[in-house]
Amino acid sequence: MRLLHPLIPASLLLTLTSATLHTSQTNTTITLTNNRLTANFSKSQGRITDLYLDNQDLLGPQSGDTGVGPYLDCYCIPSGFYTPGSTSPTLQLFTGTDKSGTSYAGVLMDETYPPTGQHFQQYWFLRDGETGLHTFSRLAYYNETTPYLRNLQEFRTLFRPNTELWTHLSSSEVQTAPLPSKKAVEEEVVVQDATWTFNNTPTDEYYVQFADYFTKYTFSNAWRDNSVHGMYADGSTSNGSTFGAWLVMNTKDTYYGGPLHSDLTVDGIVYNYLVSNHHGEGTPNITYGFDRTFGPQYYHFNGGKGSTASLQELKSDAETLADPSWNVDFYDSIAKHVVGYTPSSQRGSVQGKIKLPKGATRPIAVLTVDGQYFQDNSVNSSSYQYWAEIDDSGHFSVDHVKEGPYRLTVYADGIFGDFVRDGVQVKAGKKTTIQETWEAESAGTEIWRLGTPDKSSGEFRHGVARDPTHPLHPPEYLIYWGAYDWQSDFPDGINYTIGTSDPATDLNTVHWSVFGPTPNDPRVEYDTTHDWTINFPLSEDDLAERSKATLTIQLAGAKAASGNTDVYNASEPYTNLALESYINDQAEPLTLLIGFNQSSSCIVRSAVSCYQVRSRMEFPADWLKVGNNVLTLHLPYNATDTETAILPATVTGRLILPPQPIYGQTPVILSVIGSEKLEPLPAASILIFEIIRHQSEPLWSVPRSA
């Protein structure tokens, strides 16, 4: 491991006696320490309560659930949130030497939640010579009296400091910003659940440099693109020494949702979100026999006494560890301690070559549970997942794959649809070889397309375009949907013409049924939002001898009344939501029905790629005509659902949250259910229009498993 830090002083070495790892325990605590990192565990709380790097306190004083961690937390008991270890934990200390001769020590927190029998385990391991903690998290359920308990809605570990040491947070190059100051937080104005503005502190560095609004979703990221995230201390509160605290996703095979899954990363807390449905992917059910060990991941702490390394230097140091091959021998050595971890003796590899369609960019190969759409792999709670970028020659390779059957999915920017092959068998100690040709789907001669098939709606207005009003220029979609004004952007609604309109400005990144209110505007708009008009010309040659036409619509995310829960509610009129497409003056629409179990949350949770929904719809070619044609995309007029949420409102001072949830109406195409509350959200993103000479291919859709 590359260290960027100077040696610690001799006086400190004398205090610790040597560079060898040490452990100690009393009736109330366990301590793990090497020559640089020290972790103290509370036996009564089942978690870390003190953490030091080069004698620098990384956590600060404990106050409730702050000043602690990494620790395990979940939304998984019948009533919702629970912190494993808070009832009656037992802690066990491990010590040993791995295959390389390096000493290690570990702590296991073990607890059974009495009302349900859910069994929780959290593991932390410290190796000599490293400045971080390897973590595994386990949940097991073997209660026959209640075979189905609930869904595992959130399962996460948190590094949750309570100190002014940390000055910046970072999840990507465009998601790096100063942390809001204590004064800004004290005077913040709530504009939506988990969303604030700092307009009462206009000189705050976050407000000046990054955005007017702060939400935990601003720093969320897709797992394909995210391997390291965390916080940085610039030395201003630590005598000039810089520090970093990073979650390193060195393995991703025990998460769910594939590379499109996106989640919270850092917001003053450094998260490891093992399971959640924040952006609409499914979550596993906790049923009799559920037994899942997540990990390993690695909380890495760097910089230290005398360090002047920059944020990017410390983050780059952490990124060198974000590799599944890193520390494999160590993980094999501790497998005897970690229930449910799959050692390398039970893993193989996959190598493949895919002949890609013309125009494919950023291709990726994904291995997930056999027989299921890759975003739905949580339907098999024991499933594993892997992916690899495909190079320019079509080659990819994946190592350390758990033995078993897999589905191979290949997708790429610029190509509609996916390549899918089931039955890929991986055997322990063996290499599986794949060679395939991906033929791009087609229903005939493509007449026009609007948008880029990249599983995102970011190319449209207020998507990935960079904010011009702040020096750090974050992508606009990351900031907060209420920062923008539909009525200023589209006073007459959407009226788009193929060939002349600009998708970056003339089409919105989200199709609202109803928009508003926002913090700056109490108005609610629904007359210009629900219908979008797409104009397109056709010539005689386009229509000559054509009998059938096909409209393909691909949505980067869609919101129905079910939000993120996948729960059908018969009392809600829009539990299933219809996006209707009207061709010219035809009275009957083509209907894309978004099921209650396909609903997700994107734009109010600062994302433009969520659970994918698509359909190919045939219609008679005589619905079309020579000259201008009109496609109307129709959402229900002023469609809302009843939600429990903090809703946007015009605010002039600080809003204090009441003890009970606020009830209100929010847009059906702009609302979402989170782990405990609902919030607002988007719907339409990408279109392609095709005409064929004879019979078109069958209708195609991606049903989502419950």
From Swiss-Prot:
Domain of life: Eukaryota
InterPro entries for this protein: Carb-bd-like_fold, Gal_mutarotase_sf_dom, Galactose-bd-like_sf, GH-type_carb-bd, Polysacch_Lyase_4, RG-lyase_II, RG-lyase_III
Principal cellular location given in the protein's record: secreted
Keyword hit for NAD: no
Glycosylation sites: 27, 40, 143, 239, 285, 380, 495, 569, 597, 638
Keyword terms of this UniProt record: Carbohydrate metabolism, Cell wall biogenesis/degradation, Glycoprotein, Lyase, Polysaccharide degradation, Secreted, Signal
Signal sequence coordinates: 1-19
GO MF term set: carbohydrate binding; rhamnogalacturonan endolyase activity
Cell compartments where the protein resides: Secreted
EC number: 4.2.2.23
Pfam families linked: CBM-like, fn3_3
GO biological process: cell wall organization; polysaccharide catabolic process
Disulfide bonds: none
Cellular component GO terms, alphabetical: extracellular region
Catalysed reactions, semicolon-separated: Endotype eliminative cleavage of L-alpha-rhamnopyranosyl-(1->4)-alpha-D-galactopyranosyluronic acid bonds of rhamnogalacturonan I domains in ramified hairy regions of pectin leaving L-rhamnopyranose at the reducing end and 4-deoxy-4,5-unsaturated D-galactopyranosyluronic acid at the non-reducing end
Keyword Cell membrane belongs to the record: no
Family indicated by similarity: Belongs to the polysaccharide lyase 4 family.
Function: Pectinolytic enzymes consist of four classes of enzymes: pectin lyase, polygalacturonase, pectin methylesterase and rhamnogalacturonase. Degrades the rhamnogalacturonan I (RG-I) backbone of pectin.
Name of protein: Probable rhamnogalacturonate lyase B
Organism encoding this protein: Aspergillus niger (strain ATCC MYA-4892 / CBS 513.88 / FGSC A1513)
Species classification: Eukaryota, Fungi, Dikarya, Ascomycota, Pezizomycotina
Gene: rglB
